[in-house]
Amino acid sequence: MRKLLQIEKPAQRRRKSEAGFTLVEMLVVITIIGLIMALVGPRVLNYLGESKSKAAKIQIESFSSALDLYYLDLGRYPNGNEGLAALTRGNNAPGWNGPYLRGGVVPNDPWGHSYIYRTPGERAPYDIISLGSDGQEGGSGTAADITSAAR
């Protein structure tokens, strides 16, 4: 009996060695990515929550500056019925030199809720309040209320 010699071509050898990743290699990579996300993910979400709180504080400061300009022009702060909308439309009030907010619109807080304007305020002529991420009074963390009285 004769044995035939099989000669393997170099192109065939190359294809076998370049077959791709094994299942074990893929599982190791997916596990490593999962561990990294488990460690980094909560920190990123925490930074996002903190940045929304900071943005709300900055917007409240902007409203306070606009209300001070309104007061200088009209000699009073808007009443509870007028609210923050008085900063965008004058209602034919003598001395009104607005709009006092850019864009002519009162923006919502970073969580999409309306700001609350109360007059008289607790320790000032007015209070501006963002109810935080939960949209309800009270709370802690990102759900904590942010007020102009805290400035």
Protein language model features and the residues they cover:
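N-terminal leader/signal peptides at the extreme start of proteins
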Residues: M1-F21
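Short, structured beta-strand/loop micro-motifs enriched in basic residues and often containing a Trp
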Residues: P94-Y100
